[in-house]
């Protein structure tokens, strides 16, 4: 059975929409989810890898990673080492994500991995069973991750600072 890229991308996009809706519920302004598209040529796939954005919040890019793992918070996430992104995918991005949002496909619980933790990321190989290939990935430990609400607070603080009139 071959990997169904379109189905996986569509499912991923639905989690982008869900995370964006939660951000809006918390009052985060200027939350935008780009339209869902499928790249079908080699050039289009390469362009999508470089330029795709899951969620944009006032110019900041958030990347959503949905996993079929059960967790209710960062504290009970079942793995000690967390896959951030593929090395190829991250390194090709023209605009690096401000943060990654991890979401459980089972519970909808979330936590954030700030890209400012990049210096603490390590590299390792995984075997992607769905695609039947080995992939080099970036990993981070839980201590460099943050509860989702902390990301919300940072985004709200940024919005409030931008809304304040400039002192003259």
Question: Which residues does each PLM region occupy?
Answer:
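Nucleic-acid endonuclease domains
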Residues: 1-61, 65-168
């Amino acid at each position: 059975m071959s990997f169904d890229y379109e189905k996986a991308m569509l499912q991923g996009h639905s989690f982008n929409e869900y995370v964006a809706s939660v951000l809006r519920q918390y009052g985060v302004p200027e939350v935008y989810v780009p339209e869902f598209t499928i790249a079908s040529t080699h050039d289009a796939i390469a362009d999508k890898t470089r330029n795709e954005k899951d969620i944009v919040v006032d110019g900041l890019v958030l990347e959503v990673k949905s996993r079929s793992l059960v967790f209710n918070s960062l504290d009970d996430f079942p793995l000690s080492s967390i896959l951030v992104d593929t090395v190829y995918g991250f390194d090709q991005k023209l605009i690096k994500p401000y943060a990654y949002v991890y979401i459980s496909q089972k519970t909808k619980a979330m936590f954030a991995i700030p890209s400012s933790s990049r210096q603490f990321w390590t590299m390792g190989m995984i075997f992607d069973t769905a695609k039947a290939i080995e992939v080099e990935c970036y990993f981070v430990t839980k201590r460099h991750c943050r509860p989702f609400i902390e990301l919300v607070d940072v985004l709200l603080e940024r919005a409030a600072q931008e809304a304040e009139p400039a002192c003259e």
